[in-house]
UniProtKB/Swiss-Prot annotation:
This is Dihydrofolate reductase type 2. It comes from Escherichia coli. Type II plasmid-specified enzyme is practically insensitive to trimethoprim and methotrexate. GO terms for biological process: one-carbon metabolic process; response to antibiotic; response to methotrexate; response to xenobiotic stimulus; tetrahydrofolate biosynthetic process. The active site is situated at the inner surface of a pore formed by the four subunits. It is an enzyme of class 1 (oxidoreductase). One of its GO terms (molecular function) is dihydrofolate reductase activity. Signal peptide: none annotated. InterPro entries: Dhfr_type_II, Elect_transpt_acc-like_dom_sf, MscS_beta-dom_sf. It catalyses: (6S)-5,6,7,8-tetrahydrofolate + NADP(+) = 7,8-dihydrofolate + NADPH + H(+). Pathway: Cofactor biosynthesis; tetrahydrofolate biosynthesis; 5,6,7,8-tetrahydrofolate from 7,8-dihydrofolate: step 1/1. Key enzyme in folate metabolism. Catalyzes an essential reaction for de novo glycine and purine synthesis, and for DNA precursor synthesis.
Length: 78
């Protein structure tokens, strides 16, 4: 709130690039290794103090639905 749409959508240089040593790239197909099934395409990444490498995955079965997972929870799909 309080930002113009141009300000809210303006990219900030250097803040939103995938890490150089990223396990997965944007568009890679991945699935959860265990627990509730989730398979889809990597559409983003995140990092926190507890999760230095995490990914946003859009479901193949439910387009538009996105879940976030730490890298350790995911594996590449051929």
């Amino acid at each position: 709130m309080g930002q113009s749409s141009d300000e809210a959508n303006a990219p900030v240089a250097g803040q939103f690039a995938l890490p150089l040593s990223a396990t997965f790239g944007l568009g890679d197909r991945v699935r959860k290794k265990s627990g509730a099934a989730w398979q889809g395409q990597v559409v983003g990444w995140y990092c926190t103090k507890l999760t230095p490498e995490g990914y946003a995955v859009e479901s193949e079965s439910h387009p538009g639905s996105v879940q976030i997972y730490p890298v350790a929870a995911l594996e590449r799909v051929a």
